[in-house]
Amino acid sequence: MIMKFFDREREINEILGILDETPDNIYFIYGPINSGKTTLMMEIINRLKDDKKYRIFYYNLRGVRISSYSDFFDIMFEIREDNKFKQMVKDADVLVEGIKFIEKTAKLFNESIILPSDLAKVILSKQKGFDVFRYLERVFREMNKKGLKPVIIIDELQRLKGLKSNGELIDDLFNFFVRLTKELHITHCFCLSSDSLFIEYVYDRAELRGRADYILVDDFDKETALKFMDFLSEDILGRKLSEDEKELIYSYVGGKPKDVYDVIIKLKLGKELKDILEFMLKEEIQKLKYFLEDVKEDDEELYNKIVDALKIFKENYEIEDIKIPKNIREFLVKKNILFLNPIEGTLKPQSFLVWNAIKKLLNGH
């Protein structure tokens, strides 16, 4: 069963408002793991399905290893044999005709840009001096002239981490985005990630001050989480949960949409609520225990510093980031134990389950 969309009207209205205006910023959509960033963008795309002026290019990098330009372009483009295009370009400029082809074949929603093989041979060749991004700029310019509004969405941006050792593609990609948004105002660009450290790396490396903005998609607050439980239980279980049941669920998993959904699905399978929640917590405790065990085996001094840092969360769910030394907090963020909000300057566990695991595991410390 696929989880139905719920709420997020504030974020939806903000993004729809951005799309309605002239492009002027790159937008980083960030938040904890499984807070609903992708679901939100899919809902926005769904709401735009009848608006023929948009051309959305959505690239989900999940599960993809990217370590070179070639890897990235393999995701961005789909190469096809096209005999009609082959005949068309016999006596014409392949690049000019290519722009017309891309514009004509682009739909409202695209997970790749279709390239005829004859065009791909030219723009993806190793010829010195050819700039694929400049060519795409020409494509988007032509779309814009015809009243179309291109939108680029990069989901799971952190998958570009493999390029940190060869940062030229990150530079070129975000210079391209700056060109499309801040300079030419022809294309909206959104980048989604739960890795706020990598977002900050990109922000600094690509010199995006004054050229980028942030939209937080956080876990639900308590009031919204309880309403979400009502929504799911009525839809999936055909009944309402009691107030005590909802409070119990929230005490274990908080407002993380995926965790709440998993609880309701397991209830549908006939499992007892307390058993479901205890199992989820035990699983999280074991993950944290083994993580700490690995750290201790490698570096006991680091282990002690991490335990000291995590103990701060025994009494607080969210703290100021500088309460934990920079190298320790960044280590815990990279390991997905903590989530850093770089705008608010705060740290919190990636989920209520992680928070509860920290409190249980460190109870004797």
From Swiss-Prot:
Entry's family note: Belongs to the archaeal ATPase family.
Keywords, comma-separated and alphabetical: ATP-binding, Nucleotide-binding
GO function terms (MF aspect): ATP binding; ATP hydrolysis activity
SMART domains in the record: AAA
Alphabetical list of SUPFAM superfamilies matching this protein: P-loop containing nucleoside triphosphate hydrolases
Chain positions recorded as ATP binding sites: 31-38
Highest taxon listed in the record's lineage: Archaea
Name of the featured protein: Uncharacterized ATP-binding protein MJ0075
Organism field: Methanocaldococcus jannaschii (strain ATCC 43067 / DSM 2661 / JAL-1 / JCM 10045 / NBRC 100440)
Pfam assignment, any one: MJ1010-like_2nd
